[in-house]
């Protein structure tokens, strides 16, 4: 059975967003708040924001309104005692490595947008439409129950999605030029 849009879980999976007050964290919140599979049960951020209501701690930048139920949530510290089975991490790379590892050691599945674990040989660098088989790497991770999965940076995601259809044609070289906006 494939998990298409018709698939329904009996119970939603409880999730937490780490780094929830930043722009990437806000995007995670926006995507998860009405998701059919996930129940956003906690938001976590820096010590500066923890203890505050999310609505007070965040400068909401998303085009959709912040749901009142989420705005009333108390921002938790980024420690692995927050509720949830999956941690969607939008943490800055300067702190993500240690915190994400702590969450994985505590049994969470960590889905990271940070670059901290991108070069770890046992962490899948996943673009599901291109390399879903890369998930097999999680079997080699040292955590008894938790795991870490990450994505490549935004330029690489677009590039791999564009180049994947060319693989059967045996294109051997692609010249890519990336320019950073400022």
Please give the residue ranges for each predicted region:
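N-terminal Rossmann-like NAD(P) cofactor-binding subdomain of oxidoreductases
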Residues: 1-182
């Amino acid at each position: 059975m494939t998990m298409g849009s018709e698939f329904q879980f009996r119970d939603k999976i409880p999730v937490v967003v780490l780094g929830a007050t930043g722009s990437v964290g806000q995007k995670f919140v926006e995507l998860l708040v009405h998701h059919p599979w996930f129940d956003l049960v906690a938001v976590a951020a820096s010590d500066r924001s923890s203890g505050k209501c999310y609505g007070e701690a965040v400068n909401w930048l998303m085009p959709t309104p912040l749901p009142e139920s989420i705005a009333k949530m108390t921002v938790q510290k980024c420690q692995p005692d927050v509720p949830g089975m999956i941690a969607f991490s939008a943490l800055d790379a300067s702190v993500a490595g240690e915190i994400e590892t702590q969450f994985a050691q505590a049994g969470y599945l960590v889905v990271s947008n940070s670059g901290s674990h991108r070069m770890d040989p046992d962490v899948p660098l996943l673009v599901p439409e291109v390399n879903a088989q890369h998930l097999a790497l999680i079997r080699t991770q040292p955590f008894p129950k938790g795991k870490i999965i990450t994505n490549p940076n935004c330029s690489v995601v677009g590039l791999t999605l564009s180049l994947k259809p060319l693989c059967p044609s045996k294109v051997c070289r692609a010249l890519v030029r990336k320019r950073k906006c400022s």
